[in-house]
Structure formats: C-alpha cells, structure tokens
Amino acid sequence: LGDVYKRQAYLYDMKKKTSSLLADPMKPILEKIELGKTEPWNFTASDGTVITGKMCLPPNFDPNKKYPMIVYYYGGTTPTTRGISNPYCAQLFASRDYVVYVIQPSGTIGFGQEFSARHVNAWGKRTADDIIEGTKQFCKEHPFVDEKKIGCLGASYGGFMTQYLQTQTDIFAAAVSHAGISDVTSYWGEGYWGYSYNAIAAADSYPWKDPDLFTKQGSLFNADKINTPLLLLHGTVDTNVPIGESIQLFNALKILGKTVEFVTVDGENHFISDYDKRIKWHNSIMAWFARWLQDQPEWWKEMYPERHL
C-alpha cells in the first residue's frame, strides 16, 4: 500500500523525547478535503442507562434540509472508537450527504463489566433495544433526518445485529450486513471462533440445553419477519464467520420473496484486505444505500446488472 498511502515521517529524539515532522506528502491532498462536523450525542435509555454515541454531519450541512441517515454500531462488541482506523468511516458516508449516527450500545466493552456483559446469553436483544430506541430518539431531536430514509450497517457481530434488527423493527429502509451470523447454532459448531466466542457470549449455554437462545435469536429462524432491503457481504474464505451464514439467510429470504442481494468477495477472509477488492466492497455498500436511501439506483445497476438465466 506504500504507493497508495504515502505516510508521514517523523524524527524522534530519544533524549529530549520530542518529535519533529520530516515529511507529509499527503498534506496537499488532505487540505483540499472538507470534513463534516462531528460531535458527541448521547441519550438516556428507558432503563436509565446513558448510551454514548456521536453524530457526523455532511460537510455542507443545511439544518433546513432533510437528510437520509446511516446508523453504525460495533462489530465483536469492540467500541467503534477503539480502532486506529475504521473501514466504515463516518466521514465517507457524510461526504455522500448522509447524516451518520454512531452508537455504542449495551454489550460494548470499555464501559464497565456490567455494561459489557449485557449481551451474554442475550445475543442481540438488549443491544437491539438500545439501537432502536437511540435511532428513534435521535430522529425526534434532529428534524433534519428523513425518518423514511434510515439505513443501518454492521460487520461480524455487528452483521448479526443488522440481521437481527430487521426481525425486530421496520424503521430501517436499507440494511447492510458484512460477515454476519444468521444462525447461532451453526456459528457455534462451525465457525473458527464460534465455539470460543460463544463460551463468553453464550456462557454455559448449548443448543441442547438452551434451544430457544440458539434459535429465537438467529435471523434465519425469523427470516419471515424481515421486510427491509438487505445486502449481505462475505469473504469466501472467512475463517471466523463461515460464508454459509450469509448463504443460508440469502436462500431463506429469496424463498420468502424478500428484497435481498448477496455479494461475495473472492479469496478474502473476515476482513477485506486486498486494496482493489476493498474499493469494490466499499462501493457496493455505498451503491446499496444510494439505491434505497437516496433514490439513486443507477450505481447499483451499473455494478450489478440484472441477469436472466
């Protein structure tokens, strides 16, 4: 990636413990980029818990306009602010004229043991309540959001959350799930991380012991409740969440006549690392949201023209 991302170079003085910038080759390019305003936005949930988050506005934001909104939440219960970089960049969506709401719902680590343990043996229920309540409250307090044009996005456990949310609410007009888990049982038995992850997320619970947990919380067993246009993305060699998790939900939704598309990324694992494939993966997400949230289907149709076999 050296030819694509030209990094800053610093000289660090070990004795003085000071650093000085030697080169910043990207500065002329970055100076031309206008970023949207980002600020914290927290709300108090119905149970009294303060749920933290942030909002990111388009660079040329006009409070008198109506904007589509994208809601983003954690993957693997890792805080959305923990990583050095984030493939789901709020500023990227904001640059496309979306309001972005990033939420840290129940189950997120880094907010105390009780808070992080809320998703244990719940697999989405408490977290979904926070996301749905937070989204509704955000819209109530910000009239510039078009409530009929809200999308949601998550990956891994966040992909599971995207799928599960659509079985609980119809407030979203479009949804994107990357490497999501559709059946807790098959993930527990097949996924490279499945058994060890469930040792915490479903502590002391097993399919034969707690069948309701392993079925009722899976979107596959509730596919008939999904009405939101859903995009499934998955690397073909994902060793964390096997690609079958997306395949089986795609098949179920197709049988039910639901609106669903499935994009596979050949040769990629849980994270999309190849640069060119990552660009197409990003564009797939952006095109899907443009289709359903901005009434601009052309991008999607250009990328994935219909084929009649």
What is each model feature region?
Residues 1-5:
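Short, small-residue-biased leader/transition segments that mark boundaries at the very start
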Residues 14-17:
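Short loop/turn segments that connect beta-strands within beta-propeller blades
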Residues 65-75:
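Short beta-strand element of the alpha/beta-hydrolase
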Residues 84-103:
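Short amphipathic alpha-helix adjacent to the substrate-entry channel of hydrolases
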